[in-house]
A protein has these predicted regions:
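Structured catalytic/nucleic-acid-binding cores of DNA maintenance enzymes
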Residues: 1-173
């Protein structure tokens, strides 16, 4: 099961592979995004929050769009891989591919992803706003984590640490 550090590392891999690149193609194999085409969009950022992966995208000029976030959750079995152009995609069977993002220098392939959504960046908090401080986040706040943990003193320590509302990135969902 991917933990917060795995998602953080995955965000760094996608950052190196895609950030600053204009997408040359995209393929979404999830019903809600099946007709979405991000060709021409620029990947402006890659971040993690707990076990959520956020790819920030800038729309091409003149489209009337602005900044959007591609959200995915790895849950128990999801993964993203970056491949060089022409490299064979070998991480998982092809039927598990949910997202393909092509750029000039790399192709990012998301396998067995969950909760894939494309939302305006200004609205991404509705997907991750319930999460507590992220141990690996730039905004890590140990005092806030302690405050959240102490708010429910009758909760067993192990259960409290796994609750993503207290502390994001450790343990379950």
């Amino acid at each position: 099961m991917p933990e917060g550090d795995t998602v953080w590392n995955t965000a760094r891999v996608l950052e190196r592979a895609l950030v600053g690149s204009r997408l040359t193609g995209s393929d979404f194999r999830v019903p809600s995004l099946a007709t979405t085409d991000l060709t021409g969009w620029t990947v402006s950022g890659s971040a993690s929050r707990g076990k959520h992966l956020l790819l920030r995208l800038d729309a091409p000029a003149g489209t009337g769009e602005s900044r959007w976030t591609l959200h995915s959750h790895l849950r128990m079995d999801g993964t993203w891989r970056a491949y060089a152009p022409g490299e064979r995609w070998t991480a998982r069977p092809a039927h598990l591919i949910r997202v393909v993002l092509r750029a000039p220098a790399a192709t990012a392939v998301g396998y067995h992803l969950h909760d894939v959504a494309l939302v305006p960046t200004a609205e991404e908090e509705r997907l991750i706003g319930q999460l507590g401080p992220d141990l690996l986040g730039v905004d890590w706040d140990p005092a806030e984590a302690v405050r959240r943990l102490a708010a429910h003193p009758d909760t067993p320590v192990g259960v409290a640490l796994l609750d993503q509302r207290n502390l994001a990135g450790v343990g379950a969902p």
